[in-house]
Amino acid sequence: VAIVNPKMPDSGYPFRDLAGCAVVWKLISALRFACLDVYKQPICLLNARPSNEAYVIEAVKLVNLVEVERISETVVPGMVSISQTRLVPFLQGQQILVWDAATQVRQLEKAFGKGVEFNCYDIATDIARDIPAARGASLLKLKDQSKIARYNGKPIGELDGFLNLFVTFLLRKNGTWGPREAEELQLVALGTLADLMPLRGENRILVRRGLAAMNERPRPGLAELLSRQGLAGKRVTTGDLSWQITPAINATGRMGTPERAVELFLADGPVPRQRLAEEVVRLNGDRKQLGADSWAIVEPLARASLPRFSERLAVAYGAGIHRGVTGIMANRVASAFKVPAVVICLMEDGTAVGSLRSARGFHLDALLEPCADLFIDHGGHAFAAGFSLRAERLDELLARLERLAADARLPDGDAEEELEIDAELPHEYLTPAILDLADRFEPYGEGNDQLTFAARGMKIVAADIMGKAERNHLKLTLDCGKYKWPAIFWQEAARLNRDFAVGDRVDAAFHVARNAFNGTEIPQMILEDVRKVEG
């Protein structure tokens, strides 16, 4: 078995940022594929088509459904024999599959005469049995219906459409996408979001498929956790998962009992799963309290460290910082001070364990790699990483980080404060239908922020302060003409009656979301910023 690590520079894999959980799932899928009859079987797809007064004969060789070689020959009838083309050595010994054999034989006879015989198999009937929409259609028509082709970046030909259709057919025929894979991809989606991997390329496709499967039928264990978090029956988004599900799962590891999350997804029967879901949520509550306690330690340490690290890095370390929340603390420090952050826990066994988080697009490799010889272990990616080392080497690490920070080049910090607006909407566009537009750009997450809209002159017709323990949040009702929108403004309750009040007209930047309550979904805005309209 050869295991490809996409992050290795010479791996040959086309997408470096594939999430670790996706690498594991693809390995499992590859091992399953190796058990199929098609494994290692050479297959050749051939297509002949007229082109002006000539014929174009194209063929592609596949091994394990991956293209390994292709040729294209343009033949003017009567000008060359088949032996003068590259077709004979290319096709020799191949299992040749065609679409609509009768038509293909006619085209080949016109190109080379009736003295040339091609032994080929018409796969069209087999494919139409599994994909009825393909029955009776030409490759010219089918190529434009290929979903795979949407990711090609350029228009595809008939042979490419044939190839995509054949791959889809074989995968369906062999049951490589079914309930089992739907459940597995839900875990891949959760892992990709939890690991803060960029939602581009394969990550985006895998998360989208996992999210769709989750909304159709959440897997055992996840269903109970969704219910416990008030998400049962709701159309779940990546935002819901990132805020309410992955933190709860991660909390089991942060609190030293990662096996609880594993048991939740493996348990038989609703009763043990319900009990485990309750325990996972409880552990997440404990983690939140631990985070609040740790922040009281971390924040002043990080603030005091800024001068030492040239105002380009914030560092906090100490025995009072719990190992399970170093990542959360580093993320919070980076957000608070707008610089990369390092938070380190001093362990009882004489080691120091740290987490790094990026800010302003800074790649953490520039901090990690020059210190690699100090670490017992380290890993992660450009924007989130971790390490461990012997505690006696901590001073040496801090000295190196001090030098590295002095030379670090961070993008202008002011850019962080700018809001990028995707579209300004007139009031007549502010209908619930705007949610359907936003849905098309899912999945949102790292590398694919939610669409941010702006609207001007909306009247505040109601305002309420919200919050359980601390009433820090604001709920406004904005009059947009035909519709009045509920609008949530997190952590901004203090701005009511200071920057704006009921009756004022405001300009606002926001994204749109659904608030599910008692089985009903209510459109709402999540405000990013609000500015009172003067005059």
Where are these regions (language model features)?
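Flexible, glycine/threonine-enriched loop-and-boundary segments that flank and lead into catalytic domains
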Residues: 304-331
